[in-house]
Design a protein with these regions (language model features):
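A general structural signal for well-ordered alpha-helical segments in protein cores
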Residues: 14-18, 36, 56, 81, ...
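Hydrophobic/aromatic residues within well-ordered alpha-helical segments
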Residues: 10-14, 35-39, 77, 91
Length: 211
């Protein structure tokens, strides 16, 4: 699988991503259900061993310390989210359960790159008056949306964040930078890892000076 194909899978609901992936391999005798069953079996064995990416723990704990409202909006199903995160309680407990997953149908009907999941996280979890998808935002809604900062690694997530009217910091795998992209949405800033994150650039309290 090339990174062009992987980029088209990242951030999307699993069945949508699976259909996209398999469409590139028409000669393989594999349907979506069989593929997902085997993929999920292998992934479920690996998720509890996944390590945090550089800078994540420092940033999340910093935001929590300063009472900055934070939430997670993920394209993963809730069962997968739990598998991915339960071995890192020192980080994910900071979100206090404020998590929207792709199968939370009371909030999300469309996956990324649609803006629904980010607007739902802001509206339902952080209680921000950001309006709803597909409705023209009022001036107040637009202003409130612009105060949000989305941190994403997926191209579809970056698009969703911008379509939600929010600022977007893109932290992609280096290989994604070589993928052809013709979309209208562009991240406000791109960095290699969250170790490069400077809170003050986004109106946030600076990191404490290290002893």
């Amino acid at each position: 699988m090339t990174w062009d194909i992987k980029a088209g899978c990242m951030g999307k609901p699993e069945r949508v991503a699976a259909a996209y992936l398999l469409s590139h391999f028409p000669d393989i005798d594999l349907d979506i259900e069989t593929y997902l069953e085997e993929r999920n079996r292998l992934q479920d064995e690996m998720w509890p061993t996944v390590k945090l990416l550089p800078g994540v723990k420092k940033l999340v704990q910093h935001l929590k310390k300063h009472n900055i409202p934070i939430a997670i909006a993920t394209g993963s199903r809730r069962s997968k989210y739990i598998l991915k995160t339960s071995h890192h309680p020192d980080v994910f407990d900071c979100f206090e359960g404020k998590v929207v997953c792709s199968d939370d149908k009371e909030y999300v009907s469309r996956g990324k790159p649609h803006p629904d999941i980010f607007l739902a996280a802001a509206r339902e979890l952080l209680k921000r008056d950001v309006g709803v998808p597909d409705a023209e935002p009022t001036e107040a809604h637009a202003l409130e949306r612009s105060r949000g900062l989305v941190i994403e690694d997926a191209l579809t997530g970056m698009q969703a964040g911008k379509r939600a009217g929010m600022k977007v910091l893109w932290v992609p795998d280096a290989n994604l930078l070589n993928v052809a992209y013709e979309g209208a949405e562009v991240a406000d800033k791109t960095i290699k890892t969250l170790d490069e994150f400077v809170p003050e650039e986004w109106g946030l309290p600076p990191y404490d000076l290290e002893a």
